[in-house]
UniProtKB/Swiss-Prot annotation:
Pfam (any one): Glutaredoxin
Recorded coiled-coil stretches: none
Organism per entry: Mycobacterium phage L5 (Mycobacteriophage L5)
UniProt-recorded name of the protein: Gene 56 protein
Domain Glutaredoxin: 9-103
Length: 103
């Protein structure tokens, strides 16, 4: 269980229904925790995927996105955010919070 909003799914994923954001992460990653904390504080639902426990996720992050480290934040609406990028995260949060309020 990650907070009270997430369902632990097979130890490698933390999933919600219809989450608009996926955060690729690994255990012990402080920047990953900051990303997840920032999204949680903003009320943004997300899936957290542990790349050390999911080889398909690892391949996607390293081979498709060409990311060398995590966190990696992926959505259907924005280009991937590689690493902890507070300004890009704020833009993403603004987009999703505005779309939820209809603005």
């Amino acid at each position: 269980m990650y907070g009270d909003r997430y369902i632990d799914w097979d130890g490698a994923h933390v999933r919600t229904l219809f989450a608009p954001v996926t955060v690729y992460t690994r255990p012990g990653c402080k920047p990953c925790e900051r990303v997840k904390d920032k999204l949680t504080a903003a009320g943004i639902d997300f899936d957290a995927v542990d790349v050390t426990a999911n080889s398909e996720a690892y391949d996607y992050v390293t081979k498709v996105l060409n990311a060398m480290s995590v966190p990696v934040v992926v959505t259907d609406t924005h280009k991937p955010i590689l690493g902890y990028q507070p300004d890009q995260l704020d833009e993403l949060i603004d987009y999703y919070t505005a779309s939820e309020t209809g603005l």
